Structures are given as structure tokens and as C-alpha cells.
Amino acid sequence: MSISIRKKNFCIIAHIDHGKSTLADRFIQKAKIISDRDFKSQMLDSMEIERERGITIKSQVVTITYKSNDGDCYELNFVDTPGHVDFSYEVSRAISSCEGALLLIDASQGIQAQTVSNFYMAFEHDLEIIPVINKIDLPNANIDFVKKQIKNDLGLNEEIAISISAKNGIGIDDLLEAICKHVPSPRGSIKDPLRALIFDSHYDSYRGVVVHFRIFEGQIKTGDKIRLMHTNSEHLIEEIGVFKISLERKDRLEAGDVGYFIAGIKNISDVKIGDTVTLCDCPALSPLEGFKEVKPVVFSSVYPVDANQYDDLLKAMDRLKLNDASLTFEKDSSSALGHGFKCGFLGLLHLEVIQERIEREFDLNVILTSPSVRYKIIPKKGESYFIESPEQFHGNEAIEGVLEPYIRANIIVPTEFLGNIMSVCLLKRGVQTSLIYLDTKRVELIYKMPLSEILFDFYDKIKSVSRGYASFDYELLDYEYTDLVRLDILVNGDRVDALSQLVFKDSAKTKAIGICKKLKDEIARQQFKIAIQGAIGSNVIARETISPVRKDVTAKCYGGDITRKRKLLEKQKEGKKRMKMVGNVEIPQRAFLAVLKSNDN
């Protein structure tokens, strides 16, 4: 028994801010699954931060019903995916659950770096790709030029491209008809053993983990006992259903369906994205292909500004972890900042989102240390190991070498800004591997560069030197040898562990000078001299001095012997020496924030 041909599963993929969520809004309005009174823009972006930033952080699934012009009724399951490179694994899982993809392209901007990346991802999964030219209502929209890009850059048939304005609802009917016509129906049989792909999950305070899944073969119903094939854990299905903005309960789901199940799972880390679901009494012989553990690539420690709020921060981290399986954390402590957590993130945007959610949703002020990547240490004796923080790096031990992760950076830029972009990449230790002129006005650059070099201001810099026209995407490569050192910051000879950084040796001096200058501006003057130093091991490479507040001890001397004044000044000097020996310099929180949040460093 094969599946009804009236089911269609597709995802919406695009570069950042090309209109995915707005198009999803139009589909929802067209299907009338929510009243006009309850409708709001960015309907699927449930988090406040998503709405404010205009970005999608978590993939969202919706099932709608559409009656086509040929009179047939179609069940359309679509996934609105994130556009940022940090969440590309989430996009790949969404793509794995579909047969078709709508590739959105901004009519005013044309094909961008993430457009190309998502296209290849969909192409590798053998999806039917429908190019969609969005924002045709803009005064600078150039539909003919974008169609040429679709043909020349992507090798797609530009004649099937649908021109729409998701904002104004223009062309939505034509697009829905194209989906019904071109997206293949799901393949598979409900008689085969159950095989379903988990592509997302979220946590419900009352019912536990709600698992989002797509059934490829077989069927599932309430009361079935299931096994997750990679974790080998077994669970009893309490509820199944589909997504219609809210969860809509069903008695049974079968091959081709996209829906959810609830099985009393209390910890979201027990559910692995990409895992295969099967039945215990009639298991599948092999899992679906493509499963891999999602691993953090950026690391930073988070501390509460108020040390008394540590327990509150622990509760906040636990709550965030329930809805974000990709977030990792463990307890950490610093002599300067107190107790906190060492966290792993998918990228810088992921880090910013978590920080903002802690501050907004839990009303906590936090400090994050400088982001770092995972380095591989090759000792002269023993096995290699990984480190994520400066405290784990001991430069004096017998080390054969240090390796750092590299990326393949894909940059698309107008030809007039080519020189500017190449200069930025050179400063970031980039090695050019490819330069392709896409047409007379645009060029595609491929660079191999260290992941650590794009953590701070790389994206901002390429946007700045190209007046906002450059687009950037990257994928992780392997580890390569590097010349790494630990840069320590000392205040009056005491190391401030929270300000230590792992840096490339050639850029250590520049970074040290910048940090010392910033600390000099932020630390209040004392009655004794304060030395701020940047050091690699015992070698000081930068120094700033905060001069002491000086009392005029000779004010009471009116004329007379000069030796009297000298005695008073010598006495003051001796007193300041004693103060320096016993005096602790208090570094204000704003000084840490100034250094840690500064893109210049």
C-alpha cells in the first residue's frame, strides 16, 4: 500500500533576511488555520528575541491543507528554517525530512553566500528545488538579473522560478500550485517496519520533551513502544499529532507524515537530532543514514555579575538546556569573577542569543569571557587531547605541537570591493584557494582560515569594507598546526585569569597593548602606582602604568631648608611602597566588560 499522492513535504531555505518567515506567514493565512484576530507577523518565531532581531533561531513545522486548481486537496507539511550559518546543522536535518525545497532569493540582493550553501545542501539530499524570487515589490528589484543568476550560478531552470512578494501576498497562489505540481510525493510503504527521523524537539513544562519527527516507512499510533536506534533507549508513546500552529492530536501517523510524539521523556539530551525511531516489537534492520552528534565549536565561560545569583544562573542554564540540546555547560570558577559555567556554543550568534535570553527571561546580569575554540594539543609523550580555555594550556610542558580548527570561508562580493575583502582576509591569516567571477559585477572568493579569526569582528569588517554588500558563509574543515601562546594580563604582578586568552603568537603583542590601554582607562587611580602588563609566560610584551593619586605633603612648608621637604617626600615614597605591598587593586566589572565585549581585541 503506497502513500496518497496528495502529501507534500518541503522546507523554506534562504540567506539571512530574504523573507522565509514572512512567506511562512502568508501560507498560514492562506490556509486559514488561525483567525485574523490571533494572527501576528513572524507567526512561527515564538521567542521575543527572534521577533526583535528578525531572525529564526529554531526550525518550525506547520501542516496546512490546500485545494489546488485541479480540484485535488493537498496536505502540505513545511519547515521554516534558520538562515544563519550557526544553525546549519538544524537546516540539514530539516532538509533530510523533506522531498522539496523553496530556495528564496531577494530580488534586490540576488544570490548570496548562504543561498549557495543551502542550495548545495538541498541538491546533495536530492530535493526538488523550486527557485523563488521574493521582494519583487521593492523599487530596486531586478527580476531578470536574478533569473540569470539562477541559471548561471546554480544551474537551475530559470523558467520555473516563481516571482512573489511575501510581504504583500503577490504570487502566493502561483507558488502553492508550483509546490503541488513539482514537489514529489513521499515514497515508502506503511507495511514496512517503522523508520522515522527526529529533526527537532522542544520542552513542555507539563508533558516533557515534544519530539518533532518525519515518518519514512511504517506507521505509529498512541500506545506503541518505540526504540531510538542510536541511543538504544525505549519509550511508550503517550500522544502523537501534527503541527497546526498549536499541537493537534491524532490517533495514528503513517509514512510521509510530519508530526510530533510525546513519550514521557524528561531530559532533552536523551533525544538526539538525526536519530531514527522504530518500534520495539517490529524493529527496522538499520537506521536512517546521516546521523551525527552536533558538537559545539565556540567556548566561553559565563559568570553572574552578582556572586549571590549563582544558584539563579544554574537554574537558568538548566531551563535553557531543556529547549536547546546543542548548548553544553559545566561548572567553572575564576579567582576574579567567582563561580560560573564553561559553555559550548554552535557559533557567535548562538552565544549572543543565550546571553540575551539569560538576561531577559531570567533577569540576570552576566559576564562572558572571551570566546575561544577547541584546540588540539600533541604532547611529546602520551595521547593528544583537546583544550577549550586558557587555564588548560600550559606553555612550559613538553608539547610537540598545537592544532587549531580551520574553516572554508565562502564570500560573494561586488568586484569594486574585491581588494578590500582580500586585505581583511589576509589580516585574518586567510589563504585564498579560489577566485571565480560569477559575472561582470560579482566575484566569489574561497578562503581557508582559522576559525578563531572569525570569532570577533570578521563579519562586521567585511560588511564595513564592502558597504554591506558582501555575504559570508563557512563550513568547518580539519585541524592544522598553529603557533599558539597564552596571553596573560597582570595587574601589579597578579594574573587576572578571566582576561587570559589563547592567541596566535604574531598577533599577541597587538592584543596585549589594546587590553592594557583599555584597562588603564577603566581602573580607578589608587594612592600607589599600578602596573598593567601583558605577558607570555615570564616575558612581558606590553605595559601601561596608572600613576598614583598624590597628596601634596610639602604644602605646610613655607620656605626654609630644602632638606625638610625632601624628608617629607621620602617618607611619602616609603609609605606608598608599603601600600603597594599590601594593597589589592579592585578591578571594576565595567573593566571586564570593556575588554571582553570589545571587538578591537
Swiss-Prot record:
GO biological process: positive regulation of translation
Topology relative to the membrane: Peripheral membrane protein
Compartment annotation: Cell inner membrane
Keyword field: Cell inner membrane, Cell membrane, GTP-binding, Hydrolase, Membrane, Nucleotide-binding, Protein biosynthesis
Gene3D superfamilies: 3.30.70.240, Elongation factor 4, C-terminal domain, Elongation Factor G (Translational Gtpase), domain 3, P-loop containing nucleotide triphosphate hydrolases, Translation factors
Enzyme class: hydrolase
Boundaries of every tr-type G domain copy: 5-187
InterPro entries according to UniProt: EF-4, EFG_II, EFG_III/V, EFG_V-like, EFTu-like_2, G_TR_CS, LepA_C_sf, LepA_CTD
Pfam family, one: LepA_C
Keyword GTP-binding: yes
EC number in record: 3.6.5.n1
Role description: Required for accurate and efficient protein synthesis under certain stress conditions. May act as a fidelity factor of the translation reaction, by catalyzing a one-codon backward translocation of tRNAs on improperly translocated ribosomes. Back-translocation proceeds from a post-translocation (POST) complex to a pre-translocation (PRE) complex, thus giving elongation factor G a second chance to translocate the tRNAs correctly. Binds to ribosomes in a GTP-dependent manner.
Protein name in the entry: Elongation factor 4
Annotated organism of origin: Borrelia garinii subsp. bavariensis (strain ATCC BAA-2496 / DSM 23469 / PBi) (Borreliella bavariensis)
Gene for this chain: lepA
